[in-house]
Amino acid sequence: MTRGNQRDLAREKNQKKLADQKKRQGASGQDGNAGLSMDARMNRDADVMRIKQEKAAAKKEAEAAAAAANAKKVAKVDPLKM
């Protein structure tokens, strides 16, 4: 007599249980935060966000410079449409 997929179902149930336990641990229990105080985590996260914002600002400036380079330098004005 075989039991079918009982082993697979038990494995899935155990993985779900472990994932729920990991969620409940909070920020200090996560792998990336192990051994760090709350202040250290906040400083690390602030540094990461600062770097991301600097990259975004540089990208925005580069796009603005490219748009300005492609823009027409002399605007044509039709005096009859003024």
Curated annotation (Swiss-Prot):
Annotated region (Disordered), positions in chain: 1-41, 63-82
A biological process from GO: protein destabilization
Cellular component aspect of the GO annotation: cytosol; nucleus
Keyword DNA-binding: no
Keywords: Cytoplasm, Nucleus
One Pfam short name: SERF-like_N
InterPro entries assigned: SERF-like_N (IPR007513)
Inactivation phenotype: Suppresses protein aggregation and toxicity caused by protein aggregates.
Subcellular localization: Cytoplasm, Cytosol; Nucleus
Residue spans of biased composition, Basic and acidic residues class: 1-23
Stated family: Belongs to the SERF family.
Biological role: Positive regulator of protein aggregation and age-related proteotoxicity. Induces conformational changes in aggregation-prone proteins, driving them into compact formations preceding the formation of aggregates.
Listed name of the protein: Modifier of protein aggregation 4
Organism: Caenorhabditis elegans
Lineage per the UniProt record: Eukaryota, Metazoa, Ecdysozoa, Nematoda, Chromadorea
Gene giving rise to this polypeptide: moag-4
